Every structure is written in C-alpha cells, then in structure tokens.
C-alpha cells in the first residue's frame, strides 16, 4: 500500500515521503490517525498545495515538544506507594501513574508518551524515565518512588 506521510513517523519517513507499507498498518493506524493519505495523483497534488502549511504545523509541534522537554528536564517527581520491608512495592508504578504525577507537577504528559522499557516499576528507589514527546524530541525525568 503506497501512502504519503503527513508527518514524521519514526522508522518510516518524513513529512511528504511516499512510502510503501503493509495494508494493515496503513488502514488501521496511519490513515485513521491522519498520519498519512493514499498516494493517488489527486492526493499528491493536494499535498503539494498544502506542503508549506503542514511543514509549519510540524515545526510548531516540534517547538512545543522542545519547550515541554526543557520543563521536564528540570523536574524530579516523587511518587508514594505502599511497600514491604525490603522495598518491594505492593503493586507497581506504571506509565499512567507517572503521567499523572508529571501532569500534576505542571507539565501535560500523556501516558502513551512515557516509556518504561523494563516494564513497570516494582521497587522503591530512584529511576530515570524516558518521555517521548515527539519523533525527534525525548526527555528524561527522575522519578523517586518512596514507601508510604
């Protein structure tokens, strides 16, 4: 399935690239979320007419993500959870909990932007958590988990 990307997609291409993807990826993700459009002659002409507008919009999104990254770089978030004697949590701290704590501290973060490559946090301690704000912008936040 040939598509024209309407924004930068990690590991796929940049704005305006004509890419060939599997049909399911195109139909179920790229097209419904407005990240791409079918590569027909009419859509190519329409895209070229809107190219400057889309590039400006992409630059604004990146600038917004960079300002949020600068705010996040200064933050250290403390999350309180119940834990046993050895520091093992009863339950875990996931992306939703971290996103809520960051939003409460003043920076709007969606749970889908928080990256926990090793899974949820299950122990008391300090952790560096990656926050993926944009295809080109990633910030690291220090999360401190303390026992209640």
Swiss-Prot record:
GO biological process terms held by the UniProt record: translation
An annotated GO cellular component: ribosome
Protein name: Large ribosomal subunit protein bL9
Family of the protein in this entry: Belongs to the bacterial ribosomal protein bL9 family.
Database matches in InterPro entries: Ribosomal_bL9, Ribosomal_bL9/RNase_H1_N, Ribosomal_bL9_bac/chp, Ribosomal_bL9_C, Ribosomal_bL9_C_sf, Ribosomal_bL9_N, Ribosomal_bL9_N_sf
A GO term, aspect molecular function: rRNA binding
Described function: Binds to the 23S rRNA.
